[in-house]
From Swiss-Prot:
Family: Belongs to the bacterial ribosomal protein bL19 family.
Keyword Ribonucleoprotein annotated: yes
Stretches that traverse the bilayer: none
Entry protein name: Large ribosomal subunit protein bL19
One GO BP: translation
Positions of disulphide bridges: none
UniProt GO molecular function: structural constituent of ribosome
Signal peptide: none
InterPro entries the record matches: Ribosomal_bL19, Ribosomal_bL19_CS, Ribosomal_bL19_sf, Translation_prot_SH3-like_sf
Family annotation (NCBIfam families): rplS_bact
Keywords of this entry: Ribonucleoprotein, Ribosomal protein
GO cellular component: cytosolic large ribosomal subunit
Amino acid sequence: MNIIAQLEAEQCAKIAAKRQLPAFQPGDTVRVMVRVTEGTRTRVQAYEGVCIARSGGGLNETFTVRKISYGEGVERVFPVYSPLIEGVELVRRGKVRRAKLYYLRNLRGKAARITEKKDQRKKSAKIVEKEQEALVRVEAPAHATE
């Protein structure tokens, strides 16, 4: 590993220790908390939209978020390790089959919607829970008759 890559890895680890970003990918709807400075005041502004791309690696990694503001499409590119990003919230997971969703730029209205990804782990956990409840109900009358 060369010296530059080693320094980048150390910086990434240091920044990641301060703030944890959720694991998100293109197609996910995210809310990015951005620190905005206006004159002497600083505030945190939320920018919510669909992540349409992730690119780069190491310290140079970025993600692009697209939203529709007053009927106009707005895209913003955020560096993952930027000090201006306070945090990222995952609003919902999207089901897509592409890494770059640039085709969304040409779609309008309902055609630009992304279906929500169903989480199989939650579903299987609910099924297991229901089966356990059913077993408890079946076993309970047998103990009551003894």
